[in-house]
Amino acid sequence: AAARRTPGRRTRRLRASVTGARRTAEELGRAFPGVPVRTSGREEVLAGVPGGAGLVIATPGAEPVAEGGYGAVLLLDSWALLTRADLRAGEEALRRWMAAAALARPGTAGGRVVVVADGALAPVQALLRWDSAWFAARELAERRELGFPPAVRMASVTGVAEAVADLLAGARLPGDAEVLGPVPAEEGRERMLVRVPRSRAAAMAEALHAAAGQRSARKAADPVRLQVDPLTLF
């Protein structure tokens, strides 16, 4: 949500930065009177829709298959996918876009795909080129340079600060392990990251699980969550 100041008043109101599927459907219904408008999303996911004229408003991942394919696929709110605080945000955005775009008719049959986004961004370029391999190679090169998976192996240790510190203090990590953090986690907890070369992944995992076992044996009060190669780092 984005803050909006009301003219002439000192109060602030919040408005949604991303228009929901239902609101979008209502607006398009008024713009195209007489055209059937269907929604597919959190409340109800449609598996398919009949051919013929109509509008389908779907949230990412809930796009129904249209009989004969869609005449046009419009990808909106691209920034909402691309700006997520997630190492795989670009990868996930491209996956969802390509899945939605694949539901359009072939270009030779009049099918069109339009993405509302900055065309210079790598995921958008990959979509325009229809080249996920190019994007994957680029991502791998960047992650290798920055020291992120899959170029290295990582583990996250999440819990209250004292419990995380206790587990790491008791872990006999490989000598070349790097401990990064802390970074904020959900519900007031924190997360530390352990990074090792790919060849040392087994040693890292064994050390962390042994330390977790020691805490469990002495019935430590605060739990700690361990994840090797977590999907979310930050």
List each language-model region with its residue ranges.
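Conserved phosphate-handling catalytic cores of large alpha/beta enzymes
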Residues: A93
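Cys/His-rich short segments
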Residues: A1-R30
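Accessory helical-bundle/CTD segments and flexible terminal tails appended to RecA-like ATPase motors
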Residues: R4-R5, A31-V35, E44-G90, A99-F234
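Short beta->alpha linker loops
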Residues: T19, E43-E44
